[in-house]
């Protein structure tokens, strides 16, 4: 392919990308200014273009930051919304401790999504760090079960979560990690010096029992990377 042809292809690709971006932004502006306030708020959060000022503008138009049982904040912390948009919702009165039907909260969903910035925003705004879901699992246990290791590590290092936390059935962080870890065992290796290795759940199962069907864990141990 000649150099001129290559440059033409690159120019066309750049033009397509610019057109897609401009079209998306025009759709965002339409949603922000034309749709009903609550619907505009949700569409803007989903679009990814939204900023703190956009959130404030839409709420001034009459959007409820907690409509539909806190759906805007839930959407923000679970998605790829910018940190400033989450701050905008919080500053406009979104309830950071709203409880969803399954007993979870916005902070739980931020943790499960691996969204460390959202976790820090919510915690700074007063979100309860000691909350638990119905089975007694705290934020750290849920993070490990979801393989959200960045947020799990943040909870331990910044907020002092106990690495030996357990739920109502006696399942610990180590047991959850042994069962659910796949490729990233650096978190488990990092935890090991502080872990209680001799604890069992209510059925008498220990971390080895939870990890016996985890071929990834067995492979890492075979390589000598984990005890």
Annotate each PLM feature:
Residues 149, 155, 159-205:
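Ankyrin-repeat and related helical/solenoid repeat scaffolds used for protein-protein interactions
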Residues 51, 65, 79-83, 96, ...:
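Alpha-solenoid repeat scaffolds
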Residues 34-46, 66-77, 99-106, 132-139, ...:
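Ankyrin-repeat boundary/"N-cap" motif
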Residues 2-62, 70-71, 78, 224-227:
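Intrinsically disordered, low-complexity regulatory segments in ankyrin-centric signaling systems
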